[in-house]
Amino acid sequence: MARVKRGVTAHAKHKKVLKAAKGFYGRRKNTIRTAKAAVDRSKQYAYRDRKVNKRNFRALWIQRINAAVREFGLTYGRFIDGLNKAGIEVDRKVLSDMAIHEPEAFGALVNAAKKALEYLKEAGTANEFEGAVK
């Protein structure tokens, strides 16, 4: 059997790792052993932070919705409750965007949520609001 020399594949692998480590500080960018460890760790951080990013954006959307809804005299929790009771299914990302870029449409949603809350308060039931916007 012929002898296999690994110089070409080893060089290619090292080149791949060092390319991923480009921009790192100190020996991490040009020493293969430290670069490999740094790249592996960077992948772990990237995986973790993709999840953290989703949490952060959801929190940001909720803060924006809360700030916009308080101008209409409601809290975030009451507003979401009113939307659910009115049968309006809009996610928080869209609500946040509407609050910033389309305040009139957002105001209509707030009024629909208020109407649903008042209707159910008067009726004393937990059924869905008949005048729901679907």
Curated annotation (Swiss-Prot):
Report the transmembrane regions from the record.
Answer: none
Q: Name one GO molecular function term.
A: rRNA binding
Q: GO biological process annotations for this chain's record?
A: ribosomal large subunit assembly; translation
Q: Which Gene3D superfamilies match?
A: 6.10.160.10, Ribosomal protein L20
Keyword RNA-binding attached:
yes
Report the domain of life of the source organism: Bacteria
Q: Which UniProt keywords apply?
A: Ribonucleoprotein, Ribosomal protein, RNA-binding, rRNA-binding
What's a single GO CC term here? ribosome
Q: Tell me the function of this protein.
A: Binds directly to 23S ribosomal RNA and is necessary for the in vitro assembly process of the 50S ribosomal subunit. It is not involved in the protein synthesizing functions of that subunit.
Q: Spell out the PANTHER family in the cross-references.
A: 39S RIBOSOMAL PROTEIN L20 (PTHR10986)
Which family does this protein fall into?
Answer: Belongs to the bacterial ribosomal protein bL20 family.
Designated name of the protein: Large ribosomal subunit protein bL20
